[in-house]
Amino acid sequence: MKLVFLDALTLGDIDLSIFKNLGEVKIYQTTKPTETLERIKNADIVLTNKVVIDKEIMDNSTIKMIQILATGMNNVDLEYAKQKGIIVKNVAGYSTESVAQLTFAMVLEFMNKLRYYDEYAKTKYSGSEIFTHIVDFSELNGKTWGIIGLGNIGKRVAEIAECFGCNVIYYSTSGKNNNSKYKRVELDEVLKSDIISVHSPLNEKTNNLLNKNNLHLIKKDSILINMGRGGIVNEKDLAEIIDKKGFFAGFDVFTSEPIKKDNPLLKVKNIILTPHIAWASKEAREKLIQLAYENVEKFVNE
């Protein structure tokens, strides 16, 4: 079996040598769209995080299996792969703790104003007339936390939010989730929460879900966190309203990645941006590779 990794750089410094047990392994750190076909045309198994595998590539290669090194599968033409008899696997559940942790890191930064206090302590505290310096910050206890997308990550965030004393409500993007532990509400009610966190996939129901028609419902001093996909929140509409309304946002995902230089969110004051790293704790990446290996091993041995 010939295995080809197309974008190993996206996995960081994780050891991939275990895959040598399954056959000949070729590792590319990055792959441009124009390079994909040449690199995989004679491969049996392709491993990709974000490199696109489309109809043309499938028609002109010998691939038998595509292992997506992520949960989202938007980069592969799944319907055509099925027609061609190509097995496609993803990895689910590996990043739940990592994404939940960054969600709370962003929320707690806004709630506790850590960046402000760090700067003050380093530059002004020594000249203070009293032992402290106070600007308003708030507790999570008693706040309403609205979740958009109550999948594995959404449920984990809900559990942790409850530990902080939050009242958790959620909006089902599929319309099918009826979790009995938390109150299911309409989107407009979620957007009136003190904290709103997005954990849903990008699909026809969630694309442009938050836009100028409903972002105005977010209250002053509330917090919007997007850990789902960039296209769920209209970035232009958010940029136009967030500072005027006086709420805050934390985004780990963007409509175009890497983020473009003209992305309107780059000019927003009340926002924290991270480069799509919520999934990528060391432990999560190690788990990802182990689960991907098990998928490929099973395919090879069948």
For each of these PLM feature ranges, what is it?
Residues 154-155:
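N-terminal Rossmann-fold NAD(P) dinucleotide-binding loop
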Residues 86, 92-144:
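Phosphate-binding beta-alpha-beta segment of Rossmann-like dinucleotide-binding domains, i.e.
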Residues 1-43:
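N-terminal glycine-/charge-rich "phosphate-binding" loop or analogous flexible N-terminal tail
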Residues 28-29, 69-70, 86-97, 172:
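Short beta->alpha connector loops at strand-helix junctions that form conserved
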Residues 163-179:
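NAD(P)-binding Rossmann-fold cofactor-contacting core
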Residues 8, 150-151:
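Glycine-rich Rossmann-fold phosphate-binding loop(s) that bind the pyrophosphate
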